[in-house]
Amino acid sequence: MTELDTIANPSDPAVQRIIDVTKPSRSNIKTTLIEDVEPLMHSIAAGVEFIEVYGSDSSPFPSELLDLCGRQNIPVRLIDSSIVNQLFKGERKAKTFGIARVPRPARFGDIASRRGDVVVLDGVKIVGNIGAIVRTSLALGASGIILVDSDITSIADRRLQRASRGYVFSLPVVLSGREEAIAFIRDSGMQLMTLKADGDISVKELGDNPDRLALLFGSEKGGPSDLFEEASSASVSIPMMSQTESLNVSVSLGIALHERIDRNLAANR
């Protein structure tokens, strides 16, 4: 295995770079910290540009990650575990992490150039749910996600990277206002289908529609906003036992996209 250099001096510029990138109050985010083997590998595979990848000297550096970094010419160094403990004081301490340049924000044009359905999240704020939705949307052939009123200001949000296991860089995730999202959907000629408890049609009927759709999911508490409701072509419900009030939004999305799987996989071929 390749012998890796170890950073043992807290004054090393790389240490200061990590300190800077983990500050919560940064306003202009150009670099981000990505943690753990799986998110690192998924981010690298998605084309994210890394400045350097690090590992704690208290654990063996994963060979598969080292090989991938080598193929992509990404520098790799170890950091003394005492410095790692200081860097992530009070936080969960990752064994592997890297500093990457934040990709440019996704635009509606990035979604328009693809052919799968579009996922719209209206007022969904729990980052764990959004991360799960990113992974499911990618797996089931959606062309992108539009986040409205999510309280997320950048896809470089470390919580979102963790929750999505790094897949947030693998498909377009557009941060948008409601009016802009509705205009894009209309201009693209898509029907807006709103998922809600008392929908007009069953989710099973989604699979029969050959057209590209925009699937709207509101927050679990408030549901979709009035503006999106007015713009919807139809509302869709998921049949369930009467004693169950609602499903988690990421579960609802998985059910809806699975009904669309044949259409979306064909569109992505």
Swiss-Prot record:
Xref: InterPro entries: Alpha/beta_knot_MTases, Ribosomal_eL30-like_sf, rRNA_Methyltransferase, SpoU_MeTrfase, Thiostrepton-R_Mease_TSNR_N, tRNA_m1G_MTases_N
Entry function: Specifically methylates the adenosine-1067 in 23S ribosomal RNA. Confers resistance to antibiotic thiostrepton.
Domain of life where this protein originates: Bacteria
Membership in a protein family: Belongs to the class IV-like SAM-binding methyltransferase superfamily. RNA methyltransferase TsnR/AvirB family.
Record keywords: Antibiotic resistance, Methyltransferase, S-adenosyl-L-methionine, Transferase
Reactions the enzyme catalyzes: adenosine(1067) in 23S rRNA + S-adenosyl-L-methionine = 2'-O-methyladenosine(1067) in 23S rRNA + S-adenosyl-L-homocysteine + H(+)
Subunit structure comment from the entry: Homodimer.
Disulfide bonds: none
Protein known as: 23S rRNA (adenosine(1067)-2'-O)-methyltransferase
